[in-house]
Each structure stands twice: as structure tokens, then as C-alpha cells.
Regions:
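Short, surface-exposed amphipathic charged segments that create phosphate/polyanion-binding patches used
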Residues: 233-239, 287-292, 324
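N-terminal acidic, proline/glycine-rich, low-complexity intrinsically disordered segments
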Residues: 1-16, 21
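Long, intrinsically disordered low-complexity tandem-repeat segments
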Residues: 26-44
């Protein structure tokens, strides 16, 4: 019998509509704060959300909060039903508890690592590196945690012909590995083949490899220590994978250099791709415009537009994303 704390959980739903999704083209980056007046939809299949969006403030209960390597912890929560609707690529805005002698003023955005509705469970991987995450690291079983969400636009797996088996490539580094895990699970459930290339500074910092293998993914690990993680070798690896079975969809998270490499290769292969972006946020519900970034107006365009990572993303079209 599982003696882990189960949910004295609750949620409060707030109706929120941040306004029309029509962004006027900004002329310069410093004008981004004016983008709340209007902005254009960035992709045809991402519909404008004018209606009120129910946003849940979920009171979750900690089941475990364990170190998995010298830098990262694995947080497992019992969560109410409103939190269990999260999909791959979405995130929660977490109210971090105070640390030993400091407290985080703002919530912290955190990508979903795993959602298990049957067990009323959500999970996160996070790097302990600042005021907020040091507070999170102090959480113990049966503590409660306020998590606003699920928030943002998640990944969307493209349809493939009935005669074709989808082949999804996941390319991630560092904490970006956590974002890729639920997408791998979703793709495998849909019948797709999944190849995951996991990059880290050292083998001890590679996360999710065993979990992805157990889920059915082909996992390739590259590290700085072994001098296998440079973009030249990663590109060769992707080309070999594509030659063995054509990749039909590619995703990445966690590295600017991986973004540039994957943009070039997906354009060459003629396949779609998406990226999950990491960004500092204020409100995480589209109201404060603290997370606005420049994007290409469309694939191949030199014209820029500005979008809110929290509301229009954090998942975006790969070819429309600019380097940072």
C-alpha cells in the first residue's frame, strides 16, 4: 500500500481574458511593451483566444522532493483534477515557499515533466539555482504548494498519412530534457517512433534517459565531458537517424545552438518543428508583457513581430523563432 501523502488538494478557477490576440507589428524591440494594444495570430492553427480562459489556482500536496543528481530535484505532487488536464509543453506558475533566509517575490514558471491523471499526480524536474528553487528544494512530503495552471500552448503533433509511421525527434539539453518527456510519452501512445537526443555537460547530469527508454523511445546521449555534444557531431547523428527512418517532426528545448542546427536541418528535410522556450515571466497569463520576444512574422520572413511566451507559447514554430 502506498503511504505517500495523497491529496488534500483543491483548486480555485479564475475567469481571465487578456484581450484580443491581434499584435500590431512593432518597429523596434523597445516597443515590445506596447504590444498589449493588439497583436496578430502567429500561426494559422493556433486560434485566437478571445473567450475567458479558466485558470486554476491548484493547491497541491508534496509526495516527494528528491535529488536525482548534484543539481536537479524531482518534485512529485498530488494534484486536483484541474491540474491533471495539462498537456506536453504546458507549464505551471508556482508560488515558491521561502528559503532559509530569503523569499521569492514572483512565482516561477515550471514545465511539466509528467502527468498521471489516474494517480492524481503531476511531476516536475527543476534545477536548484536561485531564490525560488532554493525555497522549493526545502519542501517535504505533506507540505502544500500553490501551482497556477496549466498554462500556455503545448506541443501539437502533426498528422501523418495512414500509410506512414510518424517519427518524432526530440533534441534537448539541460533542464529542457524535462519538457521533452511528456511529448515522448504522447507521441509513443499515438503510435509514433521517437528518437531522443539528450545533451548535458556530463553523464551524471543526463536526466530522463531511463524513463524515455522504458516508454519506448530510442535514446542517444551526448556529453561535453565525452566531447560528443558539439553541433557538428549532433548534426551527423541527426542525419544518420533521418537516413534510417525519415523524421516527420522535430522538437527542441534548452539550447540556442541546438535551435540553429535544427532549424537548418528541418528546412533541408522539409519537415515541421517546434521549440519550447524558457523565459522569465511576471504574471504568466498574458497581462504584464514581461515575457515578450521577437519572432519572424512567418517562416523565412525578415519581418519581425512580438509575442508573449506565456500566452502565445511557450511552444512556438521552429522556423519562426529567433536566436537569443
Amino acid at each position: 500500500m502506498n503511504d505517500s501523502p495523497t491529496a488534500p488538494t483543491a483548486s480555485k478557477v479564475i475567469a481571465f481574458a487578456p484581450g484580443r490576440c491581434d499584435i500590431q507589428q512593432a518597429q523596434q524591440a523597445q516597443q515590445a511593451q506596447q504590444a498589449h494594444q493588439a497583436h496578430q495570430a502567429h500561426r494559422a492553427h493556433r486560434a485566437c483566444r478571445d473567450e475567458a480562459l479558466p485558470i486554476a489556482e491548484n493547491i497541491c500536496t508534496v509526495r516527494s522532493n528528491d535529488w536525482i543528481n548534484p543539481e536537479y530535484k524531482h518534485l512529485v505532487l498530488s494534484a486536483p483534477a484541474t491540474a491533471l488536464t495539462a498537456v506536453a509543453g504546458q507549464f505551471f506558475h508556482i508560488a515558491c515557499p521561502p528559503g532559509a533566509d530569503e523569499a521569492a517575490y514572483l512565482r516561477r514558471p515550471m514545465s511539466i515533466y509528467r502527468v498521471e491523471p489516474d494517480d492524481e499526480r503531476i511531476e516536475f524536474l527543476y534545477k536548484v539555482q536561485g531564490v525560488g528553487t532554493r525555497g522549493l528544494a526545502r519542501l517535504a512530503p505533506r507540505d502544500t504548494l500553490d501551482a497556477l495552471g496549466p498554462l500556455g500552448q503545448g506541443f501539437r503533433l502533426p498528422a501523418v498519412a495512414p500509410s506512414e509511421r510518424a517519427h518524432v525527434l526530440l533534441l534537448a539539453r539541460g533542464v529542457g530534457l524535462a519538457t521533452m518527456a511528456p511529448l515522448a510519452q504522447e507521441a509513443i501512445r499515438s503510435g509514433a517512433r521517437v528518437t531522443a537526443i539528450l545533451s548535458a555537460r556530463s553523464a551524471s547530469l543526463v536526466m530522463s534517459a531511463d524513463y524515455l527508454r522504458e516508454s519506448g523511445a530510442d535514446v542517444l546521449v551526448v556529453t561535453d565531458d565525452e566531447q560528443t555534444s558539439d553541433v557538428v557531431q549532433i548534426e551527423r547523428m541527426i542525419r544518420r537517424v533521418h537516413a534510417a527512418q525519415a523524421i516527420t517532426f522535430a522538437t527542441t528545448c534548452g539550447s540556442n545552438r541546438l535551435l540553429s542546427t535544427l532549424q537548418r536541418l528541418t528546412a533541408e528535410f522539409g519537415i515541421p518543428g517546434e521549440i519550447a522556450l524558457e523565459q522569465h515571466m511576471g504574471c504568466a497569463i498574458g497581462a504584464c508583457y514581461a515575457c515578450v520576444r521577437p519572432f519572424r512574422k512567418h517562416s523565412g520572413s525578415d519581418e519581425l513581430t512580438y509575442r508573449r511566451v506565456c500566452w502565445d507559447g511557450p511552444v512556438f514554430d521552429l522556423q519562426e523563432t529567433t536566436s537569443w
